[in-house]
């Protein structure tokens, strides 16, 4: 006979998927709303020749309907961009931007969604080498330079982007989250707003030192 404790454990295990589904529901800003102008998303590929030479990556550019090509747009950069730009997954950033810009709750903003780089295989049938941790977890100004010297100038050739650091934001999750912080920490003169989803402030590549580093920095 199953004792009561075992029965309770079984009930909780069976109920866990249902509880998880009920734990969070997307709000209206994450849903396409009738009458809200929809921005456009285009996909591109970037081969780095300067900061991360030899790496290739996909990236996406979101341009809101309200962008007029004359007024400089605010900018927000996302690491692991394929996750954030996908309107069928949880973040749905293009949809959220559509709704918030339409309501006047955020400025006209161009979104840049970057996947981490990979190094293509040198032999047929080989697998690409992922560069994510090196790019995201390293505590240096290298990734900030990548954005400022490669990506933003390239996007800036197509769209008019603001130079105001207060109108530039960067975000990411996990290693992409600590990467976002590091960019703003290294270059506060270029990025002033950070969205870090459960950033990996652990000793992957030294991120655990940030609390002490912040305390000691004037």
Task: Spell out what each predicted region is.
Residues 7-8, 18:
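Cleavable N-terminal signal peptides
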Residues 21-218:
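Non-catalytic cap/lid and distal C-terminal segments of serine-dependent acyl enzymes
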Residues 1-7:
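Bacterial N-terminal signal peptides that target proteins for export
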Residues 11-12:
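Short, linear, compositionally biased motifs with a strong N-terminal bias
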């Amino acid at each position: 006979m199953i004792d009561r404790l075992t029965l309770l454990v079984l009930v909780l295990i069976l109920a866990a998927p249902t509880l998880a589904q009920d734990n969070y529901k997307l709000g209206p800003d994450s849903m396409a709303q009738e009458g809200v102008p929809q921005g456009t998303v285009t996909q591109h590929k970037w081969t780095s020749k300067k900061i991360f030479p030899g790496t290739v990556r996909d990236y996406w550019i979101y341009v809101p309907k309200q962008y007029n090509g004359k007024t400089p747009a605010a900018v927000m950069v996302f690491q692991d961009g394929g996750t954030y730009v996908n309107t069928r997954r949880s973040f749905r950033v293009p949809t959220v931007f559509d709704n918030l810009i339409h309501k006047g709750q955020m400025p006209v903003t161009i979104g840049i969604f970057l996947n981490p780089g990979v190094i293509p295989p040198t032999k047929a049938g080989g697998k690409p080498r992922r560069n994510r941790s090196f790019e995201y977890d390293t505590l240096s100004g290298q990734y900030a330079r990548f954005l400022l010297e490669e990506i933003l100038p390239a996007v800036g050739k197509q769209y008019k982007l603001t130079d105001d650091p207060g109108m530039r934001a960067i975000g990411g999750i996990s290693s992409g989250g600590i990467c976002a912080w590091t960019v703003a920490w290294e270059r506060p003169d270029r990025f002033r707003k950070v969205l870090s989803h459960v950033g990996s402030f652990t000793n992957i590549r030294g991120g655990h030192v940030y609390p002490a580093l912040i305390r000691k920095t004037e």
